[in-house]
Amino acid sequence: MNTTEITGTSLAPDASAAVIATEAPDWKANNFRHDLWMWTEKAGLSPLTRSGTDERPQWSPDGKWIAFTSDRSPSGDSGESDTDKPNRVWLISPSGGEALPLYREKLDVHTFAWAPDGSAIYVSAKAPQTHEDEDRQSDEWKDVVRWREQYRGDLLLKISIAPALARAVAMPLAKEIPGKAAGDAEPSAKLPEGASMIAKADVSIAEIAPAPDGKQIAFLTEPIHKRIENPADYEVFLVGGDGGTPKQLTHNTAMESHLRWSRDGHWIHFAVNAANGSIEGKYRDVQGRLFRMDASSGKIERLGSSFDGSFDLFTLLPDGRELALGLKGTEDHLYLIDGDKATRLPAMAGTYAGLEGAHNADSLLVRFSTINDPQQVYLVSNPMQPNKLKKLTNFNPVFAERAQPDWQPYTWKSDDGQSVEGVLIFPPGKKGAKHLRMFTFIHGGPADADGNLFGANWYDWATLAASNGWLVFRPNYRGSSGYGDEFMLGIEPHLVSKPGRDILAGVDALVKDGYADPDHLAIGGYSYGGYMTNWLITQTTLFKSAVTGAGAVEHAANWGNDDMTWDDAWYLGGRPWENPQLYQSEAALFQFDKVKTPTHLVQGGSDVRVSYLEGETMERALQSLGIPHTFLVLPGEGHGLDKNPWHGYIKVREELKWLEKYDKQ
């Protein structure tokens, strides 16, 4: 649990250096550190920043600066409390030294991007309230929250670097934008010196992509309240480099991401990740796809359509070629995209991630891991040969000193004859052994897949379970990505029952093949893995114990309480009043009279992805039935358990104890 995880990378324009962002637990401070590291050929890897709150590094186009976000306070601003510290954009020299704030005002940055010539940075931030609105709220509404009205859209600002740097050193007072009449676009509030308003949106701006000549800015929107209620909140817009009225380019049911311009400024490339909707027709949770759009006409073309796996990140090489990460089965590899074609490039056996190209060189940064090898950052000098890697980092070396579990893929037939694949992770030295106690560990998503990649944290502790003597079965049930659209769409509208049959068929096959001891079976998962765990303990008494986290036990209240309302409705064929039968028949709660399995529950106290109330409801059901159980509430934690590392540590510690306790009975 004491691992350093790589959260981001940025490659210098000439590929001579790289910045790497990491997250690591700070056990004494009860939080996670976020730091930046610099790699150069001469000096190797060394710390670049030490504040513990630095993320999302981006090199300037000329290589002179690195911009990043941080909630550190500018010098002299000691009055900022821990609860109101905004994320600002900061600048630091590649050679290190003191970081300088791009602005001092309390603007909480959502995203940022460098201007192509490096003279400015585009920033999106929530529009400040006008003084008039602040007074009106205080006088008329007191402490009453108006549910929808409380949200404000974003401003897209252009902040010139030269005056910002001068201001960071001199620390003058903020610039006051003159008050505007009611209804005017510009707020009466403090904006940074040298900032110009490019656009004002009624929604949040999630990505910014300036055209190569700087004359146009593409940006991607998302809901201001961060709840997925309507795919129309996710669209691509175009605005002039000096401002103007934004033009909407896309009108579809997909959630676009990863905007990138072609070098000639003709195309805007983008991705739609797995389970993020569809460009073509009605909303469907298909696999990840790649597209390019004519910036003038808005016409969209799909790329790499011959690939039947799931695309993720991509990068554009200086010569215009596109490379993409594609998940196929249990591994992610690199593919060269040429129209409809997707050609797999030579690769190491394992999982590639975090693809990023240099602006002025052919080199790539990638991350790579296997089940037994922690993820590291590598430099690829020839993009056509990603199997030839130069290792830049060596985080988490302790794993090389320990006995490692072995693994193998495993395939079986479901109840309807569908072939399903998963992964078996054996205790160290036990590969191929039979009659082992088995823990079925179900991945979340459901649009995801388990395979040959490293995991050692509160969410993915499969190798830890294997090291504690469990054969770990990780099924890629229907709804998983990397196995074709038909396989992924097979989950709808039977959200838990169909994948549940896939998983139970896998357990039966492993017992029949002699791998698993039928008297020593356990099950668990988090998020959608929790959904499935909750469901399967109503369908069978095979399992001696269950460990579940952040899994819905019913769907009607969760539809109203979570932040993925639209997707919930798609999976179940409509909103609760449109398909009430499925909302009941696919919910574990309505079959809880069948539950006999001792169950360990975990829930973040502030989770909105799967409402905390789902855990409370399930606990009450188990209590009323007299089923042995325990319920751990992790205060302040959302779905990702990213506030306090002790919460994740205690979660896994207690889950392992629960499995051991009931395996021995």
Question: Where are the regions that the model predicts?
Answer:
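A flexible loop/linker signature enriched in serine peptidases of the S9 family
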Residues: T22-D35, L48-R56, A67-W90, E98, ...
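Residue-level detector of Asp-centered blade-edge/turn motifs that repeat once per structural unit
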Residues: P13-D14, P61-D62, P116-D117, P212-D213, ...
